[in-house]
Amino acid sequence: MELEESGIREECGVFGCIASGDWPTQLDVPHVITLGLVGLQHRGQESAGIVTSDGSSVPKFRVHKGMGLVNHVFTEDNLKKLYVSNLGIGHTRYATTGKCELENCQPFVVETLHGKIAVAHNGELVNAARLRKKLLRHGIGLSTSSDSEMITQLLAYTPPQEQDDTPDWVARIKNLMKEAPAAYSLVIMHRDVIYAVRDPYGNRPLCIGRLMPVSDINDKEKKSSETEGWVVSSESCSFLSIGARYCHEVKPGEIVEISRHGVRTLDIIPRSNGDPVAFCIFEYVYFARPDSMFEDQMVYTVRYRCGQQLAVEAPVEADLVSTVPESATPAALGYATKCGLPYVEVLCKNRYVGRTFIQPNMRLRQLGVAKKFGVLSDNFKGKRIVLIDDSIVRGNTISPIIKLLKESGAKEVHIRVASPPIKHPCFMGINIPTKEELIANKPEFEYLAEYLGANSVVYLSVEGLVSSVQQEIKFKKQKVKKRDITIQENGNGLEYFEKTGHCTACLTGQYPVDLEW
């Protein structure tokens, strides 16, 4: 998200909650949001923030933000600052080195002519530089280097056609989506509603859940008419711990209004020139938690299929299959099942060391590798290991692991990667470094096995990855359900053919939209 940095990029989690029925509510909104953010902690570990509101005609926004993990930022004393509240939004953030500052923590809050709004954003604007200049030309100051603040200011900026006494927030959101085609998922809070917005390409994930009465949580067959509230989240994995039931994804280009009365679709903004959907395929490969649902399929299942496809494409004579824990475990199980080899653990993980890929400093990454793994040498001494990893970005993690395994008695170590080589940076919200830093673009890639110290290295093909992701997704005509609501019938794509599509730009260099740099 940081405009001046051309290397590592952000990956964040957004969350929102609103109580149903009469207000003031008995629902503990700040705690629900906190638990939701804990469920999204893997999407960002450097800062977190929550903004709550009582939802009155002149609402008071209560804000708390801080650096660090969610549980460190939101102590019981800090949560007291967020009461009394009937709705709120939250954010957990990853940022670049030098930009990990409190001023860049989200959600952002701005005062507008028609009251305050709060915005939390996951993604990165592909035309951020141009939009920044536009705001500055109109005399709108920006206090941070984050394009999330730009989104907030663009929403606050009154469109020329809007009258002072008739704010039209849907028109403002549509204007933003026209100005910025990608990439973002947003939660926007104004007075007594939350808007959930996904860019027309659907590049970043967003879904909606229903807070159930405690007595109904574990009864999936029971169709309770009671609803304690509604939640919106980057991933569905955050729902179980708060007693929410997954409802549906926010569609690409969809603007959803969530109020105490329910959920309704206000509009769907189409993509230009009939472009396909471009959901980030790397969410399946690495970023998402395995129990999350995208496109009506579980991430774990897709990773398992990737492992099976990898076994077809890259078999090898070996004694056992193992994994670099933990995100590659489903792929390793799929590989082992397909080739008929036992799955055996060879590494144990220190769960209190952060993921090396999303720590923004090279030295922190390398130290993380050294502290992150222990070896279970009794399981593999004298044996040939097929070690499955989900991705190799720089090669900083896998090389020390191979050395560690061989020094601990492994006869051979064959690396199989359950995704294709990453060759291009992502400019749409994922932490992928510059082309020069990527191992796939270095001269050493021609002799990668020797360079890493492995006996062999083979990646899953792009075709194999896409096939594994898409094979269970149904291609069919979809009608946007009215979901107990009224949809504005404006001929704007509310009934359309929605074929699946995935962004593979980091693998192929084919970006779904033109980049403005």
Curated annotation (Swiss-Prot):
Top-level division of the source organism's lineage: Eukaryota
One of the record's GO molecular function terms: identical protein binding
Glutamine amidotransferase type-2 domain boundaries: 12-261
Key word Zinc present: no
Binding site residues for [4Fe-4S] cluster: C280, C426, C503, C506
CDD domains in the cross-refs: GPATase_N, PRTases_typeI
Biological-process GO terms, alphabetical: 'de novo' AMP biosynthetic process; 'de novo' IMP biosynthetic process; 'de novo' XMP biosynthetic process; animal organ regeneration; cellular response to insulin stimulus; cellular response to xenobiotic stimulus; G1/S transition of mitotic cell cycle; glutamine catabolic process
Cofactor note: Binds 1 Mg(2+) ion per subunit.
Record's keyword annotation contains Iron-sulfur: yes
EC assignment: 2.4.2.14
Cofactor: Mg(2+); [4Fe-4S] cluster
Positions bearing N-acetylmethionine: M1
Keywords: 4Fe-4S, Acetylation, Allosteric enzyme, Glutamine amidotransferase, Glycosyltransferase, Iron, Iron-sulfur, Magnesium, Metal-binding, Purine biosynthesis, Transferase
Active site: C12
PANTHER family, per database record: AMIDOPHOSPHORIBOSYLTRANSFERASE
Stated family: In the C-terminal section; belongs to the purine/pyrimidine phosphoribosyltransferase family.
HAMAP family given in the database record: PurF
Name the UniProt record assigns to this protein: Amidophosphoribosyltransferase
Protein's organism: Rattus norvegicus (Rat)
Gene transcribed to yield this protein: Ppat
